[in-house]
């Protein structure tokens, strides 16, 4: 049997919305249409927020949207003013990041050198800086799902890491030490072993 591919459903669940509404003691019964309308309103709101944030991300020549991009979008758009408290703790976009984008190939190298690790995917300079700002697993998974160009960009990352001398990680060879037991073994009793050796010789002959 062919496996059915699960259809991606991005709708906000009306049943969950209804439960959230009913947690308020002042709300009694909820008509069936109300959670559906709220679900659609949430979709439209999220669509407008993400479109604006996408514009900010693209203006920075970044491939991954980060919390810093969302923060800048919320601060720029007056209609999102009510979200400013949510992003107050998010670090601002660095002004130096814009200079790295105009430098071309120099940007990614500068972004990766301080504190880079072998796990990070390659990309533009802003991408590596954005990854430092956003440490969530979901954002890193999103980067692993990017197009094949990310796989090609990983190869330039190898030379900067290869420039670090690997000899520092090798430990000097230790001299061979035979295993010695911390407890002394008792010597075998000499009496019974002698007749057994004679018996074994009889079987051989």
Curated annotation (Swiss-Prot):
Q: Biological process GO annotation list?
A: negative regulation of transcription by RNA polymerase II; transcription by RNA polymerase II
Basic and acidic residues composition bias: residue spans: 98-108
Q: Which InterPro entries match?
A: CBFA_NFYB_domain, Histone-fold, Transcr_DNA_Rep_Reg
The job of this chain, per UniProt, is described as: The association of the DR1/DRAP1 heterodimer with TBP results in a functional repression of both activated and basal transcription of class II genes. This interaction precludes the formation of a transcription-competent complex by inhibiting the association of TFIIA and/or TFIIB with TBP. Can bind to DNA on its own.
> What modifications does the entry list under PTM / processing?
Phosphorylation reduces DNA binding, but has no effect on heterodimerization and TBP binding.
List every stretch annotated Disordered. Answer: 91-205
> Localized where?
Nucleus
Q: Does the keyword Transcription apply?
A: yes
Question: Which terms does the record give in the GO molecular function aspect?
Answer: core promoter sequence-specific DNA binding; identical protein binding; protein heterodimerization activity; RNA polymerase II general transcription initiation factor activity; RNA polymerase II general transcription initiation factor binding; TBP-class protein binding; transcription corepressor activity
List compositional bias (Pro residues) regions by residue number. Answer: 172-193
Where does it primarily localize? nucleus
Instruction: Report if keyword Transcription is assigned.
Output: yes
> This protein is called what?
Dr1-associated corepressor
List where Acidic residues composition bias occurs: 138-155, 196-205
Top-level division of the source organism's lineage: Eukaryota
Q: Could you describe the subunit structure of this protein?
A: Heterodimer with DR1. Binds BTAF1.
Which organism is this entry from? Rattus norvegicus
Q: Which UniProt keywords apply?
A: DNA-binding, Nucleus, Phosphoprotein, Repressor, Transcription, Transcription regulation
Q: Where is the Histone-fold domain?
A: 14-77
By sequence similarity, the record places it as follows: Belongs to the NC2 alpha/DRAP1 family.
Offer a single GO CC term for the protein: nucleus
**Coiled-coil regions listed:** none
């Amino acid at each position: 049997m062919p496996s059915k591919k699960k259809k991606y459903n991005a709708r906000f669940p009306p049943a969950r919305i209804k439960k959230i509404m009913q947690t308020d003691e002042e709300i009694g019964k909820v008509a069936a249409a109300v959670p559906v309308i709220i679900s659609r309103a949430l979709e439209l709101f999220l669509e407008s927020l993400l479109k604006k944030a996408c514009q900010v991300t693209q203006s920075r020549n970044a491939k991954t949207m980060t919390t810093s991009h969302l923060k800048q979008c919320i601060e720029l758009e007056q209609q999102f003013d009510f979200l400013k408290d949510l992003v107050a703790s998010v670090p601002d976009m660095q002004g130096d990041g814009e200079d790295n984008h105009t430098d071309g190939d120099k940007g990614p190298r500068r972004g990766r050198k301080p504190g880079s690790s072998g796990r990070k995917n390659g990309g533009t300079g802003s991408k590596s800086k954005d990854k430092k700002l956003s440490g969530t697993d979901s954002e890193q998974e999103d980067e692993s799902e990017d197009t094949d160009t990310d796989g090609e960009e990983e190869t330039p990352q190898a030379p900067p890491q290869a420039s670090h001398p690997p000899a520092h990680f090798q430990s000097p060879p230790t001299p061979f030490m035979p295993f010695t037991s911390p407890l002394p073994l008792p010597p075998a009793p000499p009496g019974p072993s002698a007749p057994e050796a004679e018996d074994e010789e009889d079987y051989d002959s």
